[in-house]
């Protein structure tokens, strides 16, 4: 049986996710680093955020999804997986891009941690000011 696969790369904060979609006849199974999403992520909201493009396009049961994700925390990893799924779905069917773009799922969230500056305690926290 020749399985057709689609690849998408997603990034968010310091996380990178390689997403592989495999067409399947049975219920869509998702594995993240060889684990179930419920075992990998601590709460359901992160999983719902990650599965949003599949729910929107109603293609959740059509694909088995294999994800390799590295770096960052859980929300960053979920955002990276979501973007990877979106990019792979667009490779599967370019007509889905219009639907996904209306929900702003195709754009990468470029927000990242601001760097620490010298003379300060953090990115913006300054030493306490003394008037006299």
Curated annotation (Swiss-Prot):
One Pfam family cited in the UniProt record for this chain: Ribosomal_S9
GO molecular function: RNA binding; structural constituent of ribosome
Source superkingdom: Bacteria
Keywords, sorted A to Z: Ribonucleoprotein, Ribosomal protein
Gene Ontology CC: cytosolic small ribosomal subunit
Gene Ontology biological-process entries: translation
Family label: Belongs to the universal ribosomal protein uS9 family.
The name this protein goes by in its record: Small ribosomal subunit protein uS9
Organism: Mycoplasma genitalium (strain ATCC 33530 / DSM 19775 / NCTC 10195 / G37) (Mycoplasmoides genitalium)
